[in-house]
Amino acid sequence: MNQELTNNPFNPLTPPKAFDEIKVSLASPERILSWSYGEIKKPETINYRTFKPERDGLFCARIFGPIKDYECLCGKYKRMKYRGVVCEKCGVEVTLQKVRRERMGHIELAAPVAHIWFLKSLPSRIGLMLDMTLRDLERILYFENYVVIEPGLTDLTYGQLMGEEEFMDAQDAYGADAFQANIGAEAIREMLSQIDLESEANQLREDLKEATGELKPKKIIKRLKIVESFLESGNRPEWMVMTVVPVIPPELRPLVPLDGGRFATSDLNDLYRRVINRNNRLKRLIELRAPDIIIRNEKRMLQESVDALFDNGRRGRVITGANKRPLKSLSDMLKGKQGRFRQNLLGKRVDFSGRSVIVTGPELKLHQCGLPKKMALELFKPFIYSRLEAKGLSSTVKQAKKLVEKERPEVWDILDEVIREHPVLLNRAPTLHRLGIQAFEPVLIEGKAIQLHPLVCSAFNADFDGDQMAVHVPLSLEAQLEARVLMMSTNNVLSPANGAPIIVPSQDMILGLYYVTLAREGMKGEGMIFADVDEVRHALDAGEIHLHSKITARLPQIDEEGNEIMVRFDTTPGRVMLGALLPLNAKAPFDLVNRLLRKKEVQQVIDTVYRYCGQKESVIFCDQIMSMGFKEAFKAGISFGKDDMVIPDTKWTLVEDARDQVEEFEQQYMDGLITQGEKYNKVIDAWSKVNDKVTDAMMGTISASKRDENDAEMEPNSVYMMAHSGARGSVTQMKQLGGMRGLMAKPNGEIIETPIISNFKEGLTVLEYFNSTHGARKGLSDTALKTANSGYLTRRLVDVAQDCIVRMDDCGTENTIKAEAAVNDGEVVASLAERILGRTAGEDVFIPGTDEIIVAKGELIDERKADAVEAAGVTTMQMRSPLTCEAEEGVCATCYGRDLARGTKVNTGEAVGIIAAQSIGEPGTQLTMRTFHIGGVAQGGQQSFQEVNVDGKVEFRNANLLKNANGESVVMGRNMVLAIMDDQGSERASFKLGYGTNVLVEDGKKVVRGDRLFEWDPYTLPIIAEAAGTAKFVDLVSGISIRDETDDATGMTQKIVSDWRTAPKGNELKPEIIIAGEDGEPMRNDQGNPVTYTMSVDAILSIEEGQTVKAGDVIARIPREGAKTKDITGGLPRVAELFEARRPKDHAIIAEIDGYVKFGRDFKNKRRIGIVPADESLEPVEYMVPKGKHIPVAEGDFVQVGDYIMDGNPAPHDILAVLGVEALADYMIDEVQDVYRLQGVKINDKHIEVIVRQMLQKWEIQDSGETTLLKGEHVDKAEFDSANAKAVRDGRRPAQGEPILLGITKASLQTRSFISAASFQETTRVLTEASVQGKKDRLVGLKENVIVGRLIPAGTGGATQDVERIAKGRDQVVIDAAQAEAEAAAALAAPVMEDAAPDTDAAE
């Protein structure tokens, strides 16, 4: 019988079919019939009294199979022995009940019906095929109009629509047989079947060659694409209209009797019943020869019911069930979070899992977790049963069960055995990155809570305020091995996002270590000298010295040769104790811990130990400093009371000063010297300056060291220790407790002018409290919204990057990108060493001025090399990047460089795309969850000057300065750069100077740190006269292009340029100010162009008409945006916007060529800016700019490629088109990093590069040449290359194309894998498109493989696949050799037996 079972066709033991790809295409009626086991003729389901399926109904046993295993419906045949017999009484085959999950039926439709997906999913495929609009199609399908199919010799045209009346008239006029017209899906089906695809395609190609204009070729290309896809896939157009509807197996749409005689049923049964009822009624009406109008109505209803079955609600009203709930159609089963893809295929529930609350387990080792005995007993049951049986304690599973239930003592012993060395996985939701699931060895504990090691909390982002975690048991040996080798917490010391240690002490431990490493003057035992660690320990225990005394001690160290030597250090007993834990290594000297350790330094220590002392040592070290930190923090007994918050004495004088200032600004505003906006900005500035001063004063008071009566230094202030060490709290929080709360933000990000002067210690007034609720509430609502947004961003990132895997070792490309230090506002935010660390050099790097190589080309740069490059004074170098990698699929290990989480070169098969997505997505959620901690206190405040932070010499580049009447130098150019050079002549800092900046230093002048270089007005953009003369106003007409704004508060009026385009006669105006000379003619500037200034909307005029103007005077001011608060809330949408590659609203315009600016004729409400190229051979280019926008260039200005002709955020597409891939990558990396840096989050650049690579995978065809590619089509780079290579081989003209940038959502939907795209978004659209094209999914990415239930082709799954591939290749070699041998033998045999020659052929 066992033999029988294994051969059973429905037995899971049969090996699954091996397949390499999945193809989806349209099903022909014959195909549907071949799947079907019979036609369903009745709408009945089951008999409600006997619960037996009705014959020929939707659950019919004859069609779908028996309801009980090996038993026919009437009960004549039972048991295995009748397997495969068909009962002659009830017609049921005797077999397993499971076949009801896989046998399909069908419904023969009495009239054809159009498939709604191909009709309504835009663009309508049927419409494209027939070249008809969707509206016309619907009119035919839903029986409103006739369509001419065969005009004959009449003067009707093919495809013409006619109403009932027209049709009758035409029949009367031409006779009934002179032409053919029809209505409904039959007509459409007939038209589709008449299409000859080949000739249609040729015809369209001809049309395409002759087509002109913008829209026509586009339409032809769309049609050509669909015709070609039908040709290629072997689908027939008429299959888009169905004559047979398949019925899915009944077990997939179950009907379950509930108690009380009611039934619970799947919605599909209702939908199918509708279809069957209408179909049967239609059949009857046709037999009865009912009037046309009735039949037509029934056909229309049949069409509607089939539409509802396939996609309910896509057309017409939604069909609802008894409880007014819309019925779930077949499409809804696939779509969305609850659909088949995301609910059941990509996310499954797991057995052998449990969850419980977590508590801290400080006495655990790093690789352990505490597992409650109760949980362990339940999770490891099968293991315990088998062990009990093996030990002979029970003979059956039942007996073992009883033993376990009684919890006999031997069971606990066995549990201990089972658990030993069997890792379990712990997971905390939300799992934002791969460190959210880690493996630990369980330690059995009493109680019901899981114990978690404190050091891994930051990786899980866990705390012990009631968080829960889930436990999973890896069952198979392979799973245990992977858990131990890859997922063990000890193997995940470094963060995959930035390569820094993530197993870092926090909070109490940091406070303890900080306290241990404090050094204080005048403590007991100061100046004592100790011979070794033991003496120090002894003295401490005896109380002869204090933990913080300054002493000298002799400690063992390792010198460069690796010998142990004793070295004397000036240190403290606390530091000696900590130093004793440090592994002995030349690279980890005692100096590492011989300093005050704050959080950052502790991280540095762990990093160094991990890098140089190996994993084992560093894990032990981490555990030891953790317990030391806890112990010392506990012994120190640090706590604080309200007197520890010190309010500085100077606070009130500072506040009074600020109040005076603010009053002065109010007065200036009343007098009309400044505008409302300027006053607001100045007030905010004044208050934020005061706030900073008060904070500084407070910090000064708190951090000052105090002495007691014995002149010994006292312990620092507790609050200060906590904040300074990085254990908890920040200066901002201390400021609110002891300084002043400062300015608050409104929910929309604006800052409220009146600050909160009180702090929490003094207590807020009622008004202040009310003001502060604003920001606090915004913080809370933000948190809720942002979490969702951030999760969605991560999901899109994962989807776009999921098939980016390391596939090869080296692609051998010569392409590289440039690496240089990231400078922000003249401050180095990321040094060159940081940026090249863990990357592959793309060129030999020399010490400047010599030919000595520091790093050879193709070498992986480690910490030592990176520091050497930086020390040698190299400022830029070329490095390999995933962006420029030429691997066909995925990326290569050399371009990617170091695997950040391991510190070694990345392994083949590493899923770097997903790691990149997680690294970018995870902090998004983190940060957004943490906005509200500061309670909406305004951060930011505008800077209006730049100080230099290095010593050096000033150097101007592209200088364009003008001295104004006050003798200040004003920048007049667009691309002036001020650089600070050191003595060797290398650049230390550089600043881009905006138009209107006042420069305070001379070219070539020496500056020292802290000097002011230049200043600017942060709130307005000035327009400055470049020549002296008289001001003449042109088209500045009061009431049309100028409004006089009288300020209610001050009674002063200002002239402000208003939007003249809205005024009745405004369209022709071109408001500008001309500087005229003595003769009334406009002055000319150096280039010989007239000096005119075009005014933009909202500019405030600073001069009157006819006034005499000196060079450098401000003519008008354009207000900039007010100071908004900076917060990742603004940041997260910014990151999403960058990755979605959206064009910003008022995006900058980038010059495409070098040349001179020339203004052309204005056009409606746009201004035309042209660039006349410097290079004669190029065509001039023109840009249209909305009128009234400020244009920073003037007539005749010389612009270079990449200069902004209009200010704003550039659109990434433009950067790609004008400046190329590398510039785009730089822009994306800088912008994304700016957002994260603001929050102090470090992310390695390569993650962003990987995502940008995925966004750049498609090429847009500019000219199709003589290939099959079509103009405007988006194809993969690989496809583009192969098509071109083929064309070149055949001597045809290759296609031209250029890379395009797709946003992450779009890129995900355009992946080669339709399964992956369908499971992401817009499922119906993706599947419709795929089936028309007959797409094949080659299962390369991760998602497709998860969905079809395979191991993913990454990591260990990738390794097994490689082995299989190699084995297959070797098999093939053997087969080929055997075949060749046979052929050779045949060839030898052939000449002898000449008659038999044809036979040998046949034999072969």
Swiss-Prot record:
EC number: 2.7.7.6
Reactions listed under catalytic activity: RNA(n) + a ribonucleoside 5'-triphosphate = RNA(n+1) + diphosphate
UniProt entry keywords in alphabetical sequence: DNA-directed RNA polymerase, Magnesium, Metal-binding, Nucleotidyltransferase, Transcription, Transferase, Zinc
InterPro entries found in the cross-reference section: DNA-dir_RpoC_beta_prime (IPR045867), DNA-dir_RpoC_beta_prime_bact (IPR012754), RNA_pol_asu (IPR000722), RNA_pol_N (IPR006592), RNA_pol_Rpb1_1 (IPR007080), RNA_pol_Rpb1_3 (IPR007066), RNA_pol_Rpb1_3_sf (IPR042102), RNA_pol_Rpb1_4 (IPR007083)
Co-factor remark: Binds 1 Mg(2+) ion per subunit.
Gene Ontology biological process terms from the UniProt entry: DNA-templated transcription
Residues given in the record as Zn(2+) 2 binding sites: 811, 885, 892, 895
UniProt binding sites for Mg(2+): 463, 465, 467
Alphabetized Pfam families for the sequence: RNA_pol_Rpb1_1, RNA_pol_Rpb1_2, RNA_pol_Rpb1_3, RNA_pol_Rpb1_4, RNA_pol_Rpb1_5
Positions with a binding annotation for Zn(2+) 1: 72, 74, 87, 90
SMART domains: RPOLA_N
GO cellular component term, pick one: DNA-directed RNA polymerase complex
MF annotations from Gene Ontology: DNA binding; DNA-directed RNA polymerase activity; magnesium ion binding; zinc ion binding
Cofactor(s) essential for the protein: Mg(2+); Zn(2+)
Enzyme class, UniProt record, top EC level: transferase
Keyword Ribonucleoprotein part of the UniProt annotation: no
Keyword Transcription belongs to the record: yes
PANTHER family in the cross-refs: DNA-DIRECTED RNA POLYMERASE, DNA-DIRECTED RNA POLYMERASE SUBUNIT BETA
NCBIfam families: rpoC_TIGR
Family membership noted in the UniProt record: Belongs to the RNA polymerase beta' chain family.
HAMAP family recorded: RNApol_bact_RpoC
Subunit text: The RNAP catalytic core consists of 2 alpha, 1 beta, 1 beta' and 1 omega subunit. When a sigma factor is associated with the core the holoenzyme is formed, which can initiate transcription.
Role description: DNA-dependent RNA polymerase catalyzes the transcription of DNA into RNA using the four ribonucleoside triphosphates as substrates.
Protein name: DNA-directed RNA polymerase subunit beta'
Organism of provenance: Jannaschia sp. (strain CCS1)
